[in-house]
């Protein structure tokens, strides 16, 4: 009996090894075939893109330059007439508030959007119903007073909706209610929304983002602050290796012509270098690893990994969808709500818009039926829609901020790289997010002087440059404290009023 058992065990072992061998062989064959397809797609779309219609490159994530966004908006406005006006009720800027000390920021933003910048889109505030249940009467009065000011901006244009918080029950961090922002994906009464975290300063309206190409359901800037100058240099080499120009001016000129002539632009947009979101240069391997049917033999632990950059979640352009909303509420949230250090940006980049998975889905659709794949995501330029205040004081991030279409340079007609000062970068940015760890948010301070940037000559390597950066940084915070006057009872500056309640 023992001899038979040993024979059986040997037989089972041989079968197991044979199955593993077959699995590995099939995988190698699949990867080889897919790698050939990827190479073909790259060459095909590089050479044939001008004549294509309704067929889109599935192996790239596309970036859209600011000039192209403006060109699309200009083209849209040229079609507007008295007989065919834009229905602005289909578009909205959206904030959410779960804490009293953030409510004033929504008032500041909405006041600027209506009174200063003149947007006609709806402005919607999702406010936690917990804010109306405080046992402190003065806090309740404070909330109601600020809400009254918000409504008085324009009772028709402003929409205030009470919501229930989505809370991580065992999390005591400042972000334990950040998942609440995901409710914005369910605002299906709008055709497109611009979601904005309100711990930021607005320098202009962003109406142009409502009119991105119609198939785009999600667009956002990238987390550029995770990159180094070395990473940036690598992206230039990668683009050139793919026989593409790194001169952004060449792309924007061609895109402008196509928009003027009513032609599709997706295949002509600059691609996001794949080294920024793939874990290796074997594109086929990454695609196969990202499929739901990937074998655990092949690095299954990497399925949820994201690359060097991912989507920021402080500014998002969204086409609300009941299907996406249901997926978030019923599938994604239960998986993440009890996980440590997993918040809104993690859910968006691991569950919804993991760039590796996006490319895998695109290729899968394209291989089944070319016309089945329609691009649905875009990368927005962070140099216009999302820098951090902390980056202003970090000279090593300035080069990245100047070239916000990653892998490409702003080069003039003479072939010279266009140099932008940090003042120009900040001036041209529409949305600047307060992020200066270990400093707190500006409303945590009673006056600007408490957080004013000052240069220490003893420790500075370049006093003049550091002072310039400080001056730019200070100008943003000074502007915030000035704008915060709108929240005070008697319209006098009381920057810490919300905290005092």
From Swiss-Prot:
UniProt-annotated location(s): Golgi apparatus membrane; Vacuole membrane
Residues annotated as glycosylated: 176
CC terms in the record's Gene Ontology section: Golgi medial cisterna; Golgi membrane; vacuolar membrane
Record membrane topology: Single-pass type II membrane protein
Keywords from the named record: Glycoprotein, Golgi apparatus, Membrane, Signal-anchor, Transferase, Transmembrane, Transmembrane helix, Vacuole
Biological processes annotated in GO: protein N-linked glycosylation
Protein name: Glucose N-acetyltransferase 1
Organism: Candida glabrata (strain ATCC 2001 / BCRC 20586 / JCM 3761 / NBRC 0622 / NRRL Y-65 / CBS 138)
Lineage of producing organism: Eukaryota, Fungi, Dikarya, Ascomycota, Saccharomycotina
Gene name as annotated: GNT1
């Amino acid at each position: 009996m023992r001899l038979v058992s040993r024979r059986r065990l040997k037989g089972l072992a041989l079968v197991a090894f044979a199955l593993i061998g077959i699995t590995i062989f099939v995988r190698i064959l699949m990867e080889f075939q897919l790698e050939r397809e990827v190479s073909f797609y790259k060459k095909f779309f590089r050479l044939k893109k001008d004549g294509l219609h309704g067929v889109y490159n599935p192996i790239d994530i596309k970036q859209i330059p600011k000039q192209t966004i403006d060109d699309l908006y200009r083209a849209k406005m040229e079609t507007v007439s008295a007989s065919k006006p834009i229905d602005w009720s289909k578009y909205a800027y959206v904030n959410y508030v779960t804490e009293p000390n953030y409510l004033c920021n929504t008032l500041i933003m909405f006041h600027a959007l209506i009174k200063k910048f003149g947007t006609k889109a709806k402005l919607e505030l999702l406010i936690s119903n917990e804010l109306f249940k405080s046992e402190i009467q003065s806090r309740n009065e404070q909330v109601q007073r600020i809400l009254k000011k918000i409504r008085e901006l324009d009772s028709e244009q402003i929409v205030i909706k009470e919501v229930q918080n989505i809370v991580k029950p065992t999390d005591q961090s400042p972000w334990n209610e950040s998942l609440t922002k995901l409710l914005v994906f369910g605002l299906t009464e709008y055709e497109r929304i611009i979601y904005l975290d309100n711990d930021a300063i607005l320098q202009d309206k962003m109406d142009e983002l409502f009119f991105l190409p119609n198939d785009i359901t999600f667009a956002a800037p990238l987390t550029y602050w995770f990159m180094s100058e070395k990473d940036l240099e690598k992206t230039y080499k990668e683009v050139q290796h793919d026989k593409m120009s790194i001169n952004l001016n060449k792309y924007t000129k061609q895109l402008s012509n196509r928009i003027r002539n009513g032609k599709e632009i997706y295949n002509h947009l600059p691609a996001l270098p794949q080294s920024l979101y793939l874990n290796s240069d074997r594109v086929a391997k990454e695609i196969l690893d990202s499929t739901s049917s990937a074998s655990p033999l092949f690095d299954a632990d990497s399925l949820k990994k994201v690359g060097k950059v991912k989507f920021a979640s402080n500014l998002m352009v969204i086409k609300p969808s009941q299907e996406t909303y249901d997926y978030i509420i019923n599938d994604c949230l239960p998986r993440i709500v009890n996980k440590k250090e997993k918040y809104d940006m993690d859910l968006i980049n691991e569950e919804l818009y993991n760039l590796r998975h996006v490319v895998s889905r695109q290729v899968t659709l394209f291989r089944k039926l070319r016309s089945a794949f329609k691009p649905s995501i875009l990368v927005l330029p962070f140099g216009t829609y999302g820098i951090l205040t902390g980056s202003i004081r970090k000279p090593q991030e300035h080069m990245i901020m100047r070239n916000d279409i990653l892998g490409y340079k702003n080069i003039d007609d003479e072939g010279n790289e266009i140099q932008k000062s940090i003042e120009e970068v900040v001036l041209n940015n529409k949305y600047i997010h307060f992020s200066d760890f270990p400093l707190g948010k500006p409303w945590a301070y009673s006056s600007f002087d408490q957080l004013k940037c000052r240069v220490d000559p003893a420790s500075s390597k370049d006093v003049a440059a550091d002072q310039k950066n400080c001056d730019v940084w200070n100008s943003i915070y000074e502007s915030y404290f000035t704008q915060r006057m709108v929240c005070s009872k008697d319209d006098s500056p009381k920057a810490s009023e919300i905290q005092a309640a």
